[in-house]
């Protein structure tokens, strides 16, 4: 539809050019005519549809945007013991709300893997001293297509609210991995994995041990690639308030029973939060992190490592020390150039087909009357990606219920503190296949909110030839959704405030999900209720 409108726009533009050519008086009017046509095309090419408010969708509700199933949009919703799937049409009109009555009372976690016209729903629940990991198939109408199937069970020592199993899948969704991590003692973990294909047929069941040097061991992301290979990083810190001084890359081939451990030599560096990403195009693993040169010092640069699966060797390793010009791009309006990256966090690692990759970071912090902002707590505190509890079970950070908390997600211990959340500039770095920096650029924004970070930060989606960032900006005391794109050469195009915005809806872009090449679903808050908007570009 947008391409057709674009052709019509070009046709009209050509006719205007023929009429105006050679006529100076008419040429004076050309700018306003062309501007009007361009604005008309921009308005037509962008479309926003809002769902109606459902009085059952309170702001305390947990939810997950499942995605596009057939011609429908499916959203999972949970409030207390109620579980439903709401099915919307292409204009976000509610077609049905399907209760998931088969779910037991004590559901610990729910995950969805969407395909073209169905989705797998994997959930875990506890019955007496047994935790079950089960699966059902959901059709495009939100209805159950199969009886529940138990994928695995685990014995536990009593009642608990924490999940045991984690689920990850490959980029092409043809490999699905369910795993659990049991802490045996202070220095030993046992990891059990179940690898399935996209028919949910079991391909491989494995179990292996991991040794850590002390109680300060932490793990990175857990990933599975299109071949079914499993990878994660095992990190070591010298203390609970320190950064990473040692990391091993742990790799298990899909059909193997043993693991390969690749030590990473950090020399004089210590690392911040470590991010991993599979490059399925080139059979590589990309690892990246900010690094420090001094204890309690400033972030000095960006460390990157590329590990080649085929040769099982390190293909590239780079330390990018930030220049003053990069620091000027990254810092906040009132920030210091030396500390420009101290509040930046890596949000995305994006591989491309030629072996290069992009790294996206965001400036993010909070302030409180009672407690100063602490990067250590954000990275290693309870509920965060690197948290490693020392009870019977260790579980990875893929708990979808955590994060959909609209009230002060840093208030982990019940204090009623006033908290202001701040999210500012986005930095994008692009490296070639050898790990050399090709370009960097900044998307400038200035966001803050009190008592909740649900309306700040951003969401990105990839259209193939560019990456689009969506984020709120305050204009005349109102939060308005903004858009900016960056192309393969690092050129940024900042679009004006999105058209057709309903000022009564507050967007929460960080919880959005891309459901098509140019379509994204974003949750909104309307008064005290959650609803959803579909945006097409």
Roles of regions detected by a PLM:
Residues 68-80, 117-126, 173-185, 228-239, ...:
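Short beta-strand elements that form the blades of beta-propeller/WD-repeat-like
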Residues 290, 347-349, 356-365, 404-425, ...:
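Loop/turn-rich, solvent-exposed surfaces of beta-rich toroidal or solenoidal domains
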Residues 81-86, 128-136, 186-193, 240-250, ...:
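Structural motif
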Residues 52-85:
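Beta-strand-rich domains and repeat architectures in extracellular enzymes and scaffolds
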Residues 133-141, 190-201, 244-257, 300-313, ...:
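Beta-propeller blade signature
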Residues 263-272, 316-341, 441-458, 489-516:
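Conserved blade-ending motifs and adjacent loop-strand segments that build the rim/top face
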Residues 56-69, 111-116, 125, 163-173, ...:
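Structural signature of eukaryotic scaffold interfaces centered on beta-propeller domains
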Residues 93-131, 148-161, 209-218, 444-445:
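Blade-loop segments of beta-propeller domains
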């Amino acid at each position: 539809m947008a391409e057709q409108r674009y052709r019509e726009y070009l046709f009209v533009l050509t006719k205007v050019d023929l009429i105006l050519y050679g006529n100076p008086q008419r040429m004076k009017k050309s700018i306003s005519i062309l501007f009007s046509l361009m604005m008309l095309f921009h308005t037509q090419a962008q479309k926003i549809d809002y769902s109606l408010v459902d009085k059952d969708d309170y702001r305390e509700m947990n939810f997950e945007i499942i995605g596009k199933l057939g011609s429908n949009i499916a959203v999972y919703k949970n409030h207390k013991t109620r579980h439903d799937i709401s099915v919307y049409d292409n204009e976000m009109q509610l077609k049905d709300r399907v209760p998931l009555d088969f779910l037991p009372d004590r559901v610990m976690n729910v995950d969805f893997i969407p395909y073209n016209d169905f989705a797998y729903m994997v959930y875990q629940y506890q019955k007496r001293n047994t935790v079950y990991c089960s699966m059902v198939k959901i059709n495009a109408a939100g209805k159950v297509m199969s009886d529940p199937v138990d994928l695995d069970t685990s014995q536990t020592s009593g009642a608990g609210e924490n999940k045991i199993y984690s689920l990850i899948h490959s980029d092409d969704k043809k490999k699905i991995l369910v795993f659990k991590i049991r802490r045996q003692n202070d220095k030993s973990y046992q990891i059990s994995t179940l690898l399935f294909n996209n028919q949910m047929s079991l391909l491989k069941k494995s179990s292996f041990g991991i040794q850590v040097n002390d109680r300060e061991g932490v793990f990175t992301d857990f990933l599975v690639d299109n071949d079914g290979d499993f990878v994660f990083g095992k990190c070591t810190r010298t203390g609970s308030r320190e950064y990473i001084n040692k990391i091993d890359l742990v790799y298990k081939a899909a059909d193997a029973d043993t693991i390969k451990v690749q030590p990473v030599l950090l020399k004089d560096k210590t690392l911040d939060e470590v991010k991993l990403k599979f490059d399925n195009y080139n059979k590589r693993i990309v690892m990246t992190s900010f690094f420090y040169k001094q204890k309690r010092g400033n972030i000095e640069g960006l460390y990157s490592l590329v590990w080649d699966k085929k040769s099982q060797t390190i293909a590239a390793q780079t330390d990018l020390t930030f220049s003053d010009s990069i620091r000027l791009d990254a810092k906040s309006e009132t920030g210091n150039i030396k500390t420009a990256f101290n509040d930046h966090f890596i949000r995305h690692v994006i591989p491309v087909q030629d072996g290069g990759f992009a790294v996206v970071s965001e400036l993010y912090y909070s302030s409180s009357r009672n407690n100063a902002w602490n990067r250590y707590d954000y990275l290693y505190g309870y509920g965060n990606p690197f948290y490693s509890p020392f009870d019977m079970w260790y579980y990875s950070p893929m708990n979808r219920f955590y994060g959909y908390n609209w009230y002060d997600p840093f208030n982990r211990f019940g204090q009623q503190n006033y908290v202001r959340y701040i999210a500012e500039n986005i930095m994008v770095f692009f490296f070639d296949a050898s790990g050399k920096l090709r370009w960097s650029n900044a998307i400038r924004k200035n966001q803050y909110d009190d008592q909740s970070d649900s309306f700040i930060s951003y969401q990105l989606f990839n259209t193939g030839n560019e990456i689009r960032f969506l984020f709120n900006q305050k204009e005349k005391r109102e939060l308005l959704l903004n858009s900016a794109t960056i192309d393969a050469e690092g050129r940024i195009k900042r679009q004006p405030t999105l058209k057709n915005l309903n000022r009564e809806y507050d967007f929460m872009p960080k919880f959005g999900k891309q459901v098509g090449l140019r379509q994204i679903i974003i949750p909104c808050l309307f008064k005290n209720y959650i609803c959803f908007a579909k945006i097409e570009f």
